[in-house]
Amino acid sequence: MLSFLKAPANAPLITDKHEVDARYRYWRRHILITIWLGYALFYFTRKSFNAAAPEILASGILTRSDIGLLATLFYITYGVSKFVSGIVSDRSNARYFMGIGLIATGVVNILFGFSTSLWAFALLWALNAFFQGFGSPVCARLLTAWYSRTERGGWWALWNTAHNVGGALIPLVMAAVALHYGWRVGMMVAGLLAIGVGMVLCWRLRDRPQAIGLPPVGDWRHDALEVAQQQEGAGLSRKEILAKYVLLNPYIWLLSLCYVLVYVVRAAINDWGNLYMSETLGVDLVTANTAVSMFELGGFIGALVAGWGSDKLFNGNRGPMNLIFAAGILLSVGSLWLMPFASYVMQAACFFTTGFFVFGPQMLIGMAAAECSHKEAAGAATGFVGLFAYLGASLSGWPLAKVLEIWHWTGFFAVIAIAAGISALLLLPFLNAQAPRETHEA
């Protein structure tokens, strides 16, 4: 590994309590802002193609099946990259690993705007998926390193809103730019923004607290649950930690299976929602994308409620809140599907409620994976469940396009409603577990 990409060594420990407190407060705030901004732009360059899809479809460059194929290719590549990058990021310098990944996705988005053939689109979008995997595992590692167990839900939820801000803005920006200059210019604008923010990441981000002379966060906050996780698995090699706390951890596997189904719903609404609005209500691209943006707005609020609730109502136990939100997904998807009349306002409201409930488990499952694993394997654990999440998301691409061709929108909503129902059942074992990892170890 290039020397600047290696995780920095521990710096001499600062002994002055006031300086430790001041540095912790400063860097916790700045790191959260930086990873939030960075991940919003990762999401911006991830969803740029989806936002432009109706315009590309109308131009005749790609068919509906082609768009579904590209979505499936992206999700599979991204899922694999997320897992591999999670393992690598646990040993890498966070600031450069995440920053370089974002710059690379920006370059790929710009090149996509110059492309004309399906093969070029497929190659570039797979390459974009690969570099997209550099983002989320780094964020999970930093959130685990800088925020302790009993407060992490709220902070993780704040970071998670970057998904929603990026996801809500890109349809609006893409639609506005495409309306005046074409979808190709929209892809280039997204790419240029990503390159600029990627440079900011390389400048402002930092690695774990020990790298700048601070004690571990559990010691600083006197958080017993956090200290217990910090001390667990002492003396194990990285390979042993990966095997014991990730690959052979039954709770990680259960969370992974649930993530598959949650992401079927999330990706289906995200990727096909604007087309559904265009075809069923006959609205234009800007109006359709505005409704899809309500999905992200609902997710913004839902993630905050889920994180706050799991901290304050259930003392850091993610299980009960996960189950409540999974049941809400089923109800909101059913409302969107079975609405007895065509109303743009009501459809947009259903997009909002679906987003509200989807982004609870979307955020909490990743956090639960980090907390069910080892402190030094947070990136690998979230990357592993992320692999399964995007295998689920890949089902919303080409396979769901085929469902649409045969059974139309009725089949589409039946599939995602079933996925929502099963996901709720898979979360039942976590309902009464304060710390599934500790139960497993006992």
From Swiss-Prot:
It is found in: Cell inner membrane. This is Membrane sensor protein UhpC. Belongs to the major facilitator superfamily. Organophosphate:Pi antiporter (OPA) (TC 2.A.1.4) family. Residues 52-66, 119-121, 184, 266-289, 344-347, 401-410 are periplasmic. It comes from Salmonella typhimurium (strain LT2 / SGSC1412 / ATCC 700720). InterPro entries: MFS (IPR011701), MFS_dom (IPR020846), MFS_trans_sf (IPR036259), OPA_Antiporter (IPR051337), Sugar-P_transporter_CS (IPR021159), Sugar_P_transporter (IPR000849). The gene is uhpC. GO terms for biological process: glucose-6-phosphate transport; phosphate ion transmembrane transport. One of its GO terms (molecular function) is glucose 6-phosphate:phosphate antiporter activity. Residues 1-30, 88-95, 145-162, 206-244, 311-322, 369-379, 432-442 are cytoplasmic. It holds the Pfam family MFS_1. Keywords: Cell inner membrane, Cell membrane, Membrane, Transmembrane, Transmembrane helix. Part of the UhpABC signaling cascade that controls the expression of the hexose phosphate transporter UhpT. UhpC senses external glucose-6-phosphate and interacts with the histidine kinase UhpB, leading to the stimulation of the autokinase activity of UhpB. The chain crosses the membrane at residues 31-51, 67-87, 96-118, 122-144, 163-183, 185-205, 245-265, 290-310, 323-343, 348-368, 380-400, 411-431. GO terms for cellular component: plasma membrane. It is a multi-pass membrane protein. The lineage of its organism: Bacteria, Pseudomonadati, Pseudomonadota, Gammaproteobacteria, Enterobacterales.
